[in-house]
């Protein structure tokens, strides 16, 4: 169990997390969530620790009960142009900007914060320590996983539905044999190699 997180003094807190920094294909997806203290959601945890069935149930519950939630993203072209870190920060800014309720404080999973118009704090292992960040991690993961299933339907040979774009042995093998799709991140070394650019 990770240490207890001490919340900042604020009345409206948003949690932010990202999914998809490591994959070779697709967008990096972020979510920002403001929970409603009068409508608690039981069982929020880091999305990676939950079964897919539980994640999907919580995703629906968060959509229904949260005061506000928003998704952000940075596309492969932006990742290639900016680099993955800066693209992730941009996607986080987009998620926060999309909230229908403006938070007075933002808690972000990880060790750095994007520039935001309100105070923010980075929380290491926040997805398992802060309910708002756990909720954001679930929203982002379910969204990105669904996008990978859709991409799998367009490009069935690559196995995107299984590995979600991460550089598994199978994915690397298919990348070498078939080349890159238009959705692959060209700045990532295995994709560069497949395109003969490395």
UniProtKB/Swiss-Prot annotation:
InterPro entries: RNase_HII, RNase_HII/HIII, RNase_HII/HIII_dom, RNaseH-like_sf, RNaseH_sf. A divalent metal cation binds at residues 17-18, 109. Its main location: cytoplasm. Residues 11-198 form the RNase H type-2 domain. Its EC number is 3.1.26.4. The keyword Cytoplasm applies. Endonuclease that specifically degrades the RNA of RNA-DNA hybrids. This is Ribonuclease HII.
């Amino acid at each position: 169990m990770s240490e207890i997180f001490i919340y900042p003094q604020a009345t409206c807190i948003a949690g932010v997390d990202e999914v998809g920094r490591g994959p070779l294909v697709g967008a990096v997806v972020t979510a920002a969530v403001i929970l409603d203290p009068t409508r608690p959601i039981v069982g929020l945890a880091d999305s990676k620790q939950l079964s897919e069935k539980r994640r999907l149930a919580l995703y629906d519950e968060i959509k229904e009960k949260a005061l506000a939630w928003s998704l952000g993203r940075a596309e492969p072209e932006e990742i290639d142009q900016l680099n993955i870190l800066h693209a992730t920060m941009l996607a986080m800014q987009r998620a926060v900007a999309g909230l229908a309720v403006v938070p007075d404080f933002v808690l972000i999973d990880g060790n750095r914060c994007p520039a935001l118009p309100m105070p923010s704090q980075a929380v290491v292992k926040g997805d398992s320590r802060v309910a708002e960040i756990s909720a954001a991690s679930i929203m982002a993961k379910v969204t990105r996983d669904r996008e990978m299933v859709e991409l799998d339907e367009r490009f069935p040979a690559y196995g995107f539905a299984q590995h979600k774009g991460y550089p598994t042995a199978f994915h690397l093998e298919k990348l070498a044999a078939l080349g890159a799709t238009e959705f692959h991140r060209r700045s990532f070394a295995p994709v560069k190699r497949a395109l003969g650019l490395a």
